[in-house]
């Protein structure tokens, strides 16, 4: 019976083929498809689609044809059938959409899953009615559905909204679409665009979306109005302000380069670069700290620049640079800032002391306290009016030969600390989360007479000399968010180059270096007691190994055995090759398994792709890895 059926199938096809050639004429592009290397049946099927008017030959570029040619005949016919059955009415880039269908097919094939034909999509009648009512456009790709962007001129004719106008919407039912989301959120204010992320494998949404409003007030109103809103029985939305990241952290920058040098050089290899944030060494204003932040006009430009710089094919000043997403700045609530009585003072000379600051600022009002950290300080006033007056009059003035900058201090980010605590609780290692907020710069290692020494030496334990906890506990302000929210956590970036010793093993990352030089006197005090400040490294009596637990000092003692070779040697920039260099913020000590830890704003495709990264050659879908509520994953 099977042979008979198969025979009939072949016979029917043989009967149909002459009918096709006689009754339906091939388009002028059929021969081109054959010459491009497509199998005859595949070329005929694609030519049939051209004749239906769903897509024109000019809509498909060379990359789409090349990708289709790589499929076997059965797979190519299946892809074209799915493409033909898809609703292309809102698809503006049909070539990209076809590539997305091919990518989805391969993923299903790899997973051994079949196309879910029963999956319910959006109600096209309701979608059409929504678009007719609002005048917005809808652009559909395999990875997202984009409503608006820009909106009609009758709604908003200004420039594209900036930071603080976007919200993240989580916990969306998977079969819910624009016809239900838009009427709810447009109550908060005019919408610039709505991006509903789609899962090509299931055909449904991914459970979250990004909505950009035409103003900050509308975005804040959307959070108040729609957070915890029951959009369906038992289904409550989660809504919060989202920050689209358009800033990159770049390491391995020559320290003699100026802001203008960096802007010019990176503008040659990336597009959309609008600013460079560069910080100088406190003791030498002519040198930078070995890193900078590149700010791009939008997240799309930043994502493209990041991929390009990480490829290893692009070199800056002859070297491959380290590139990561920078932690985005989250602006505090205006109502909270209106109560701040603390000033953040930066660009202080090394000779400036707390006493000098107290004398300079006390003339504006009574001070509660002054705390100087490195080349910046916090000045606490008892009265807000005095703080504002001091800021207005002292900003830009010179103290000890340096022009200072003053802004109101930002209160601590409680949500970030909660996230840090959650990550810390789930981690077995004793080290805190370096990858999100590395510790401040540490004092130089002890200069003594002990032999040995290490190289690398920039990964200090966070509890060592840590002003973060001290300052948060006693002062209540989070200094990580100052200088644009980026500089302070990376202050110690270039420390690794300074630690070099004679003899001894090569140290691994992640712990303070042992004392360097030749010999060191034993600490004062009674024999048998630990030296105070033991985390600084092993005292006399051991050699070589780094970062181990504190050892007790027993009088003068005898010299210990030679330490083992340390872990990865850090701090040296690779001169050539295509491997992305290790970032000094990303510790990779093998013993601690740090290399597997996430880094701030790392694209989400490695731990679960929330970005809808299925677009045309990955270029259309990767740009929305915004910061959003982690609790709604």
Curated annotation (Swiss-Prot):
CDD domains assigned: NURR_hnRNPR (cd21067), RRM1_hnRNPR (cd12482), RRM2_hnRNPR (cd12488), RRM3_hnRNPR (cd12494)
Known function: Component of ribonucleosomes, which are complexes of at least 20 other different heterogeneous nuclear ribonucleoproteins (hnRNP). hnRNP play an important role in processing of precursor mRNA in the nucleus.
Compositional bias segments (type: Pro residues): 437-446, 511-524
Pfam families: hnRNP_Q_AcD, RRM_1
Lineage: Eukaryota, Metazoa, Chordata, Craniata, Vertebrata
Chain intervals for the UniProt region annotation (RNA-binding RGG-box): 447-567
Low complexity bias locations: 525-541, 605-621
Protein's UniProt name: Heterogeneous nuclear ribonucleoprotein R
Cross-link Glycyl lysine isopeptide (Lys-Gly) (interchain with G-Cter in SUMO2) placement: 13, 171, 359
Gene3D superfamilies per the UniProt record, alphabetical: 3.30.70.330
Region annotated 3 X 11 AA approximate repeats of D-D-Y-Y-G-Y-D-Y-H-D-Y, chain positions: 462-497
Modified residues (N-acetylalanine): 2
Gene for this chain: HNRNPR
Bias type Polar residues, positions: 588-604, 622-633
Entry's disease: Neurodevelopmental disorder with dysmorphic facies and skeletal and brain abnormalities: An autosomal dominant disorder characterized by global developmental delay with impaired intellectual development and poor or absent speech, corpus callosum structural defects and cerebellar hypoplasia on brain imaging, poor overall growth, facial dysmorphism, and skeletal defects. Variable additional findings include hypotonia, seizures, and ocular defects.
């Amino acid at each position: 019976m099977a042979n008979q059926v198969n025979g009939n199938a072949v016979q029917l096809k043989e009967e149909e083929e002459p009918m096709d050639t006689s009754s339906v004429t091939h388009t002028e592009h059929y021969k081109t498809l054959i010459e491009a290397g497509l199998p005859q049946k595949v070329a005929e099927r694609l030519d049939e689609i051209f004749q239906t008017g769903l897509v024109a030959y000019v809509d498909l570029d060379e990359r789409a044809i090349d990708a289709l040619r790589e499929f076997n005949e059965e797979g190519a016919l299946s892809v074209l059938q799915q493409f033909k059955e898809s609703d292309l009415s809102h698809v503006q880039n049909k070539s990209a959409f076809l590539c997305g269908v091919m990518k989805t097919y391969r993923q299903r094939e790899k997973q051994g899953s079949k196309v879910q034909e029963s999956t319910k999509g959006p109600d096209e009648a309701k979608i059409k009615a929504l678009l007719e009512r609002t005048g917005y456009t809808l652009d559909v790709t395999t990875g997202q559905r984009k409503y608006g962007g820009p909106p009609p001129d009758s709604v908003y004719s200004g420039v594209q909204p900036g930071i603080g106008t976007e919200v993240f919407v989580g916990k969306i039912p998977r079969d819910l679409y624009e016809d239900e989301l838009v009427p709810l959120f447009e109550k908060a204010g005019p919408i610039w665009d709505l991006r509903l992320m789609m899962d090509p494998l299931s055909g449904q949404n991914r459970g979250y979306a990004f909505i950009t409003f035409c103003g900050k007030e509308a975005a804040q109103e959307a959070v108040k109005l729609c957070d915890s809103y029951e959009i369906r029985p038992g289904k409550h939305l989660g809504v919060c302000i989202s920050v689209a990241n358009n800033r990159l952290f770049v390491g391995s920058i020559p320290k003699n380069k100026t802001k203008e040098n960096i802007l010019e050089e990176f503008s040659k290899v990336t597009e959309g670069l609008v600013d460079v944030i560069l910080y100088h060494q406190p003791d030498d204003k002519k040198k930078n700290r070995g890193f900078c932040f590149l700010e791009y006009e939008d997240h799309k430009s930043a994502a493209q620049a990041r991929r390009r710089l990480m490829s290893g094919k692009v070199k800056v000043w002859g070297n491959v640079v380290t590139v990561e997403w920078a932690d985005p700045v989250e602006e505090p609530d205006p109502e909270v800032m209106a109560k701040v009585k603390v000033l953040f003072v930066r660009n202080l000379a090394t000779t400036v002391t707390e006493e000098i600051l107290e004398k300079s600022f006390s003339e504006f009002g009574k001070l509660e306290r002054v705390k100087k950290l490195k080349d910046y300080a916090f000045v606490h006033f008892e009265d807000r009016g005095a703080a504002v007056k001091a800021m207005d009059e002292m900003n830009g003035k010179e103290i000890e030969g340096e022009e200072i900058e003053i802004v109101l201090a930002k209160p601590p980010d409680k949500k970030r600390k909660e996230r840090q605590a959650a990550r810390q609780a789930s981690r077995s290692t004793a080290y805190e989360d370096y990858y999100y907020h590395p510790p401040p710069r540490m004092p130089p290692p002890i200069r003594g007479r002990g032999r040995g020494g290490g190289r690398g030496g920039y990964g200090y334990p966070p509890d060592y000399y840590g002003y973060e906890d001290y300052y948060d506990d006693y002062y209540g302000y989070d200094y990580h968010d100052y200088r644009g929210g980026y500089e302070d956590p990376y202050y110690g970036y270039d420390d690794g180059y300074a630690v070099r010793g004679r003899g001894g093993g090569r140290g691994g990352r992640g712990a303070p270096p042992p004392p360097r030089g030749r010999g060191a006197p034993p600490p004062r005090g009674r024999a048998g007691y630990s030296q105070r400040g033991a985390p600084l490294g092993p005292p006399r009596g051991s050699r070589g190994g780094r970062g181990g637990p504190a050892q007790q000092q027993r009088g003068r003692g005898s010299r210990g055995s030679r330490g083992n070779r340390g872990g990865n040697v850090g701090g040296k920039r690779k001169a050539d090759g295509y491997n992305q260099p290790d970032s000094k913020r990303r510790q990779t000590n093998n013993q601690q398994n740090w290399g597997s830890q996430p880094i701030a704003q790392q694209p989400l495709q490695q731990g679960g792709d929330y970005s809808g990264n299925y677009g045309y050659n990955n270029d259309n879908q990767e740009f929305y890895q915004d910061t959003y509520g982690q609790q709604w994953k």
